[in-house]
Each structure stands twice: as C-alpha cells, then as structure tokens.
Amino acid sequence: MADDRNDALARPISFAARHGAGHERALVLGGGGLWFVAWQVAYLDGLMKRGVPIESADLVVGTSAGSLVASIVSAGRLKRVAGQVEFLARVPALLGVLSGDGELQPSQQRAVDLFGAATDAEPDTIRHIGHAALAAQTPPPDRLRRSVAAVLAIRRWPKALHTTAVDTFTGERLVVTADSGISVARAAAASSSVPGIFAPQPLHDRRAMDGGVSGTGTHSDLAAGAGRALVLSLGANAPSTDAGMTTAPGSRERELEALRASGTPALLRGPDSYDLTALMDPKQVAAAFEAGDARAEEDAAEVADHWG
C-alpha cells in the first residue's frame, strides 16, 4: 500500500491527459514567496468581498507559495486568514518563521544559484538542482512543516486541494491529493521547499522540493479539461522574454495556450509589478496585501463574468 501511494505521487506534466476533466471551476495558484502569499490572499478575498464565489472552486491547484493559499481556500478559511494576514502584516517579525534563516551557507547558496540561473526544465537540470538541495546545510525539515502547520491549522485534507512538488533525486513532478495519505502541512511544506532555503520534505519514500523546480510556476496542466480556470501567476504581467528558475522564455504564454486548447477557458491574473529580491521579506507583506486588494477591485467584474 505504501509503495502504491509512493508511486502514485509521480504524475508527468501533460495537457493532453486532461487531469481537470469533470471539474467545473479550477483555481490555479502559483509560487512567489511570502509576498505572493499575501497578494493572493488579499486578491482572492477581495474578489469574494465583491461577489465572486471563489470558494466554489471544485479543483484548487497550489504550487510553492500557492500551495499555502490553495490549502486555505479549499478549506473555506479565506476570509478568516485574510484578516489574520492583514493583522500580521503590521507585525512582520511574526511572519519571519516562513521566510527562512538570514545568511546562507555556501552549500545553500549553491542550490539557490543553480535554481535561479536555470532556464530549462530538462530532467538533468532538475536533478542537478535537487541534488544540490539535498546537500545544502538547511534547517531540519520538520521546522518548516511545524511552521506551516501552525499557520494553516488544517487537519482534514480538503477534497478539491492538489499540491505539487518535485522529487529531488528523480526530478519527477509529484502531485499530492486527498488520496495520498500525506498531511496538508507536509504537502504544503514540500511544495514550498525552495532549494537551498528549506530542506527537502519527506513525501512517503521520496524527498521533495519546491513545485516550481519544474519549468512551470503554476502546473496549470492539472486544470486542463475543467469547465473554466482562474490562474494566478507572479509573472503574469512580466515580459515574455523573462527566464530563470527552470522556466524558459515564453513558457508562461505557451502554458496558457495549451490550457485553453484543452477546452478550458482560462483567465490569467497577477501583480502589475514586484521586486524579486523582496519576495521573502516579511516587511513587504503589508504592501503586497494592499496591491492584491487593489487589483481585485479592478478585476472583479471581469472575473465574475468568467467564473460564472
């Protein structure tokens, strides 16, 4: 049974597989550090306050920072957490537990640099980053898991929730669901384990790192075939020539085209701008929250029409 669950975690990236078929509304939430956690929470809560029933999503896909928000939304706790984030934004030190330690050791910096510089998602590239993540002198895995558990406080796995991660040794994409036999906190911690910053997390017999080490920051193929999808990506409005962190130039646009070609009407949204160097800075959470709510006000009518 354990071997079956271990093997079932691996799911190749494929839009043709139409993983989202049978679902009416898919919410796809990408990575982007603490900053994007706050932005997404404020944006989605802002949409809800303006009449868009975001929590009606029957498929919620979360990657990296998005796995935390996906857990919150699928558990029906968005409104409550939005109030907490707004409060915590005024006390940045309380958010520090999720931002990693300060100065990096050389072994950590090596993994961070490899991930940041990667412009493709070839298996050898991903495995090279994974091996560096395993070798990095990071805090023990349970430290992040406990911090995530304290923030989420979710014991029962929400049926709609799917989180992503990457096997550090094989480079395979891993998808954790209600059938995987893994806690929400462990799954979200694995999805958020940035190479060199946090230790890879145990998912059954695998050691898993950030779901973004895969050529995609959203894994929107998991929504392919759904009735409609709302995709939140940190780089939604960034130049298509941008590359790094295993994504190639134009990959975001190709992914959106493939999702739509699968028969899923998709809307892509994200911040107008962001500071890549400040994504893990707790002091920037308040500004991210304000930006997310402001964008929700701009987008509410269009998203409501799309969401149905």
Per-segment meaning from a language model:
Residues 1-61, 71-308:
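Patatin-like phospholipase
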Residues 62, 66:
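Gly/Ala-rich beta-loop-alpha elbow adjacent to hydrolase catalytic centers
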